[in-house]
UniProtKB/Swiss-Prot annotation:
It is a multi-pass membrane protein. This is NADH-quinone oxidoreductase subunit K. GO terms for molecular function: NADH:ubiquinone reductase (non-electrogenic) activity; quinone binding. It comes from Psychrobacter arcticus (strain DSM 17307 / VKM B-2377 / 273-4). Keywords: Cell inner membrane, Cell membrane, Membrane, NAD, Quinone, Translocase, Transmembrane, Transmembrane helix, Transport, Ubiquinone. The gene is nuoK.
Length: 135
């Protein structure tokens, strides 16, 4: 207890200590604002986005729309990680978001390359004729 009091006294004696204390206040206010939005709202939004993406993958037969729906699903999962990470004030959610964002970019690049190849071969983007592709 004495150590904590001496550290607090030393911090108070540091020049510009009031400016450092002024920088801490906006961070605390930002964390309070995050507490105003319930976690359930963010997770419900992520679930709705995931369901929309899943319906798009299952219903649409166009390869481009299926790729876009898959991106929506990945963004919904990333949103769920960010919401959960902000709820528990843990940076792991944001780290997973960056990982998912990188994975989505790689998936989009490979998917678009396959899409272009498929379109040049077939002249359309209907996925039902994909089983006729040859090596």
């Amino acid at each position: 207890m004495v150590l904590a009091a001496s550290v607090a006294q030393e911090v108070a004696n540091v020049p510009f200590a009031h400016e450092v204390a002024g920088l801490v206040q906006p961070v605390a206010e930002a964390q309070n604002v995050l507490g105003l939005i319930p976690m359930s709202h963010g997770l419900i939004l992520a679930g709705i986005l995931f369901a929309i993406g899943l319906c798009g993958v299952m219903v649409r037969r166009n390869f481009l729309f299926m790729l876009m729906s898959l991106e929506i699903m990945m963004n919904a999962a990333a949103l769920a990680f960010v919401v959960a990470g902000s709820r528990w004030v843990d940076p792991d959610g944001q780290i997973m978001f960056i990982f998912i964002l990188t994975l989505a970019a790689a998936e989009a690049a490979i998917g678009l390359a396959i899409l272009l190849r498929f379109y040049h071969q077939r002249g359309h983007l209907d996925v039902d004729s994909a089983n006729e592709m040859k090596g």
